Structures are given as structure tokens and as C-alpha cells.
Swiss-Prot record:
It is found in: Cell outer membrane. It comes from Glaesserella parasuis. Belongs to the outer membrane OOP (TC 1.B.6) superfamily. OmpA family. The gene is ompA. This is Outer membrane protein P5. One of its GO terms (cellular component) is pore complex. The extracellular loops are most variable in sequence, and in some bacteria confer sensitivity to phage and/or colicins. It is a multi-pass membrane protein. Coiled coil: none annotated. Does not bind carcinoembryonic antigen (CEA). With TolR probably plays a role in maintaining the position of the peptidoglycan cell wall in the periplasm. Acts as a porin with low permeability that allows slow penetration of small solutes; an internal gate slows down solute passage. On a 2D-gel the determined pI of this protein is: 5.5, its MW is: 32 kDa. Its main location: membrane. The chain crosses the membrane at residues 6-15. It comes from the Bacteria. The keyword Ion transport applies.
């Protein structure tokens, strides 16, 4: 997942 979107993707993909 893009680290630039880690705040958003992290909640969904855990990355």
C-alpha cells in the first residue's frame, strides 16, 4: 500500500 496514504490504507489494508 502507498505510504503516502498509510493513514487511510493502514486502517483498511494494515500497511
Amino acid at each position: 500500500a502507498p505510504q503516502a496514504n498509510s493513514f487511510y490504507v493502514g486502517a483498511k489494508a494494515g500497511d
